[in-house]
A protein has these predicted regions:
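Residue-level recognition of single "structural anchor" positions
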Residues: 1-292
Length: 292
């Protein structure tokens, strides 16, 4: 197996981090104490490297999701490898079986990978060009406590669904965020944060999107209420396709996701979407992000 050949044990994983973060040749690195390049050697009793001159220690895992984790470094790397090999992700239950760890540990590992390594909502590079924008709502059937009493004393069930906003460049990247509400101010605020004013915006006819032509290059709408889904270049099929992939993937792999952790799963699917045409493998991309 290719993974085991490259990362046969914790020492091999630590050496990869050391070379990626501090020492290209595996021997010399900039010593903060000496303030110059020095030779370092591996400390046998701890996951660090020591300067041959002054004894200062450098820790390859410092500032990463692996730092001070009781889970072995090889298992962390293998979790990222497994997560990168599927189109729809891997559940905590399956990872528990694959790694031989507890469900709690598996869930925590996946949660950190999604929210630390796959989160691109804060990416400073905004979207540009032709940008499709749409919102979807995530949530299942209401539970027993999700009821409201109407004025006539009748109990009715409510659907507490969570809005997710998607913004995608045609042929390019996507930004997707879980929103606290689907109000116009909230949606437009996120759009202005992630999309350049020089962009042409494509949306449906929802009133929330009124007035976008004032702050962007242009705004074209498609009238879904009239059963029109494509009108020349006006459509939102790209972003709708992403939402379909996301919902089908979550339903098939994770079955259900709570609102509290929903952004992490949105991060995961957006991260994969943004690398659909990349030459670099998803595993290599995750490793690079972990070492950044």
């Amino acid at each position: 197996m290719e993974f085991m050949r490259e990362f046969s044990d914790d020492a091999a994983c630590l050496d990869w981090l050391w070379r990626s973060r501090f020492s290209k040749d595996g021997h010399t690195a900039e010593c903060p104490k000496c303030e110059r390049s020095r030779r370092f050697h591996r400390v046998a009793s701890r996951p660090s490297y020591s300067c041959d001159t002054c004894g200062h220690h450098l820790h390859p895992t410092a500032g990463t999701i692996f730092h001070k984790s009781s889970t072995s470094l090889q298992l962390w790397f293998y979790a990222m490898f497994l997560m990168s090999q599927t189109r729809c992700g891997i559940s905590a239950k399956q990872l528990e079986r694959e790694l031989g760890v507890t469900y709690k540990t598996a869930w925590r590992m996946l949660n950190l990978i999604r929210n630390q390594l796959m989160d691109e909502t804060g990416d400073g590079e905004p979207l540009d060009g032709d940008v499709e924008v749409d919102e979807t709502y995530y949530g299942g059937r209401p539970r027993a406590y999700e009821t409201r009493t109407s004025g006539r004393g009748r109990v009715r069930r409510t659907w507490e669904k969570t809005p997710v906003l998607g913004m995608v460049e045609r042929g390019g990247r996507i930004k997707a965020e879980v929103l606290p509400n689907a109000g116009g101010a909230t949606i437009k605020g996120r759009m202005h944060h992630h999309i350049l004013p020089s962009s042409m915006i494509f949306t449906d006819e929802l009133w929330t999107y009124n007035g976008l032509e004032k702050t962007f290059k242009g705004h074209r709408r498609i009238k879904h209420s009239a059963r029109v889904y494509v009108d020349g270049e006006s459509h939102t099929q790209t972003v709708e396709g992403f939402f379909g992939l996301f919902k089908n993937g979550v339903r098939g792999t994770y079955h259900a996701v709570s609102t509290k952790w929903l952004q992490g799963y949105v991060n995961e699917y957006a991260w994969r979407y943004n690398r659909r045409n990349a030459r670099q493998s998803h595993f290599a991309a995750l490793l690079a992000q972990a070492a950044a």
